[in-house]
Curated annotation (Swiss-Prot):
Its main location: secreted. One of its GO terms (molecular function) is cysteine-type endopeptidase inhibitor activity. It is found in: Secreted. Pfam families: Cystatin (PF00031). This is Cystatin. Residues 29-129 form the Cystatin domain. Expressed by the venom gland at an extremely low level (at protein level). Keywords: Disulfide bond, Protease inhibitor, Secreted, Signal, Thiol protease inhibitor.
Length: 141
């Protein structure tokens, strides 16, 4: 009786072991971790900071301190899910042409006692063939 179970048990154990291995294949529409230094992630972060400052009612610009986490999802294009830390700068938003990302990143920070840091969650949708990248969702605290 024991011998009759062996042919079934061995393949079943092998199948279970294979299912426990990390999968190298991508699941369509799934979220995947991305390196925070990846150029596509950096481009999405620039868009997020630029749009945050354009939409924010704050009188001062906020600059990127760091990207805490980055994930992407294949959609019609790519959607990036970013967790970022932003810091309020000394650069005031004045009338005229708004500052671009690189200018904002060069803004000085206030003294430690006056610093305001935000943790933000951004979703950025990139469609390179249309030369379009846009912020679709944000929340900061």
């Amino acid at each position: 009786m024991v011998h009759s179970q062996l042919p079934v048990a061995a393949p079943l154990r092998l199948l279970c072991a294979l299912l426990l291995l990390p999968s190298a294949t991508m699941i369509p529409g799934g979220l995947y971790p991305r390196s925070v230094t990846d150029p596509d992630v950096q481009e999405a972060a620039e868009c997020a900071v630029q749009e945050y400052n354009a939409l924010s009612a704050n009188a001062y610009y906020y600059k990127q301190l760091r990207i805490v986490e980055a994930q992407s999802q294949v959609v019609t294009g790519a959607k990036y899910y970013l967790t970022m830390e932003l810091m309020k700068t000394k650069c005031a938003k004045t009338t005229g042409k708004p500052k671009v990302y690189k200018e904002i990143q060069n803004c000085e920070l206030p003294p430690k006692a006056q610093q305001e840091k935000l943790t933000c969650h951004f979703q950025v949708w990139s469609r390179p063939w249309l030369q379009k990248i846009e912020l679709t969702k944000m929340s900061c605290n």
